[in-house]
Amino acid sequence: MSIHEECGVFGVYSQRQEDVASLAYYGLYSLQHRGQEGCGIVVNDDGVFDGHKGLGLVSEVFTGSVMKQFPRGKMAVAHARYGTTGGSNLANCQPIQVNHLKGKLALAHNGNLSNALQLRRELELSGAIFHTTSDTETIAYVITRERITAPSIQAAVSRTVDRLEGAFSLVMMSSTKLIAVRDPHGFRPLCYGKMKDGTYIVASESCALHAVGAEFQRDILPGEILTFDCDGIHSDTSHCGTAPKKMCIFEYIYFARPDSVIDGVSVHDARVRAGEILAKTHPADADIVIGVPDSGLDAAMGYARESGIPYGIGLIKNKYIGRTFIAPGQDHRVDQVKIKLSPVESEVRGKRVVMVDDSIVRGTTSGRIVQLLRDAGAKEIHMRISAPPFLHPCYYGTDIDSREHLIACRHTVAEIGEIIGVDSLGYLPLENLRDLCGSEEYCSACFDGDYPTSIPEDTRKDQFEQKLSQRKAGEKP
């Protein structure tokens, strides 16, 4: 009950005219957990782009009347947004559409650029006019500028990859091609699948492939540029291996859906392993193990399995409200917690409870959940967290924007436990983090401060928009 992720991207390429908008709709539905601020779909009907985007959930933005207005087409690009740069307004919703000298471009982006301000300044000095505060528009403009001299859109994208720093998983389309790109570190997931009729699907997670009936083909490699067109699939691996692979390990702990498989690792299995490790490193004398829905459930199963303590359903989630961390602003977050979870009193009353959750960022949500269980009659509450303490901001597409918001930066574990009101508190040990996925090829900078890339001084999630506002006001950033 903690941190939030960035966005979900989805793309469709078909050799024939079909209802690609509906495929994009169902794909976004499966990626809704990655972003709930807004969403958008752009359909390519023989080079004519038709798009719609709005603030809200997929079901709210794409009503039946809206979906009927989409033409049939051969391609579509779609996006579910949570803003890691730029404010929560319609202009910052994606996909971004750009008309340029040599054609059109529709772009959806998952991640966060660490050099967005520098690139934007260079573009503005050369005459670019921006309409959003999103770094996705910056990427789109870099591509279109490179396309002026590049022999093809693929070449323009390749040149753009050389200029981008940070995390970016992209799905874009020109008039004739669908292109998927994953940054050289592979911070964010991206994969593709194939339907029985030959239609190709690109998505942030494999769960979205299954939702539309596509068979998973493979993950897109870190640094790979994959192009789909009338001649088939073309893979450009010239950027592969130029940087160490650093997939965000928090995808497995919290962001991704448990039924997804990312880079060959089951998200569900990784979470269960986290719970098993917690049971060994932080045992507790208890009567029941419960998980905080949703991402704490799998880890709770692992804890119960390893400890031998019965697993139970102690908290029920209101499925019609989004993740607490996804709502922008602390006031919204507190309001949502009050209606999001309800305790199952018969399961917890008079019992010593082990409550497993994925993380504690600010402590706001955790304290409220603990109080819910106390009010329901829990005798003891032993909280176990399936990740190490958050000690450092993330600059690669999540909403851990500054150290001042991280409770673990200001308090010891014992103090945090006292603040949130538990009888004991235990985190997944940092040295056991790699055991979740059986590899060292992961980014864990939010836990250990070991950033894979250079980070601009004082960079924050909201710095991009703050500096843009200062420029407009004539201030020196």
Sequence positions of predicted segments:
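Short, glycine/charge-rich flexible loops or terminal/linker lids adjacent to PRPP-binding catalytic cores
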Residues: 308-353, 363-364, 391-397, 401
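Secondary-structure transition/capping motifs at alpha-helix termini
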Residues: 128, 149-150, 283-287, 305-312, ...
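Conserved short alpha-helical segments that host acidic/polar catalytic motifs at enzyme active sites
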Residues: 1-222, 227-286, 292, 380, ...
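Extended, hydrophobic alpha-helical segments in both membrane/secreted and soluble proteins
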Residues: 289, 296-303, 307, 311, ...
